[in-house]
Amino acid sequence: MSAVVMGYPMPILLNWNREYNRPAWHFAGSHIAKLESLLGAIETLLESKSDDVGEDDVAVLVDAYDMWFQLPPSVLLERYHRLNSEADARIRKQWKDLGISTDSPISPPRQDIIVTTAKDCFPDSYSGSDPHYEHWPKSPMPKDMYGEDTDKVPWSFDPARKYKKVRPRCVNSGLIMGSMGGLRDALKRSKEKIDTVAMKGRQLWSDQALIGEVIGDQEIWREWMRHLGSSWNGSAAFNDRNSLDRTVRDIADVALLGKRFEFGIGLDYNFTTAPPTCSSEEDGYFVNLSNETNIREESQKAGVPGDIRIHGIPSELRNIKDKLLSSTNWGTIPLYTDFFFGTIPIAIHHNAYINGLKGFRLKNWWHKMWYYPHLRHLITRRLQPTSSPPTLAEIDHNGDKIAYKSPQEDKLHKARVFSPKKPNFTPIDWDAVCQKPGHAVKWHDELFGDDKGPLAV
């Protein structure tokens, strides 16, 4: 419902009332199903040959149970393009610093898919999955962003807070977004890994492990590409295999047989999309962006070294075209903010579990969301019939203007359930989505808290 309030397209639900207990999946049933179902939905949409769906359209996958949106889709799309551009610039600089010629037949990779980041690198090789994190890039964030102890992991019984001062550079699969075509190809690679692992009887831990392995293979492949590119003399590259790590040689051998490893996947190092709150339990809170005193007090409470890192309203929030949000004063409403990164995330990912924080925040923080006092009104307005789906954003990107619109099916203003069997996308009533079976409290009473009864649209 937070996505509906903020004007995102009507959600497509994956694995609704599905069974996850395949023996080959071991403990990772719902996680593996998340990726397989997303692949199935994307393939079904792209194969429909509809003029409404294309390979360049952007899809967003989020965890359904612990993610609250607080900013509109135009901001997410603006940041998506910005993060991709920043990643492309870093890679071009890296190649230039290595002396890789611009006439090399190998071009620097470009980013298309973004995955949220984690401070703790899990699962690791001890779990049976091996993302090869030692081959991943270092974080581009400042080396002193947490002070002199940045990136130090103290000995501790606390499994989460010991990573508090680590700059995130590993994968968290709370949010994955990218072009439909790019996601399809990357998810096919993930499915290949699922099938291979299942045949070998190896433990499958999570979708996070699978995405991590795909990214790990990609980073190793990129290492090999840099090795070849740096020796390019205008007509040939010197493939000195003996100087390569064994892991790189293995990827190179398979790549020479035609296997693809580059999928344009990168990470949200900046914590601007929907970063996890695990290992960042006290790093953020709700503040008014125009209230510097409020920001300073909360930054000091969080332990931010030096001066405050939030300075007013982000530019992408200053010109919201959404009519329902256009009069919102973004500086005077409470927005969840990470004080170390100086960012206002698109959404809050409530996976901070230490001392029962997840359950506590899911129950006690909902009323802190800026739209809570207006929730019923906003949702009622969002669900009104329209003649055509709204424009979500118009992005200026490298001199081109890109317009993003909701799908035609959004005229129904209902969530849809994906099924691999036809009908593939079945509308579902909000009562069925929001009411937990056997739960004594009605969903509308819990969600709105206004004693006005059921939602009337």
Could you tell me what each predicted segment is?
Residues 142-360:
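Catalytic core and acceptor-binding pocket of nucleotide-sugar-dependent glycosyltransferases
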Residues 28, 57, 86, 101-159, ...:
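Intrinsically disordered, low-complexity, Ser/Thr/Glu/Asp/Lys/Arg-enriched terminal regions and linkers
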Residues 1-2, 15-17, 72-75, 127-130, ...:
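Short coil/turn segments at secondary-structure boundaries
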Residues 1-58, 78-87, 91-94, 181, ...:
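N-terminal anchoring/stem segment of glycosyltransferases
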Residues 4-13, 82-90, 109, 217-224, ...:
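Structural alpha-beta junctions
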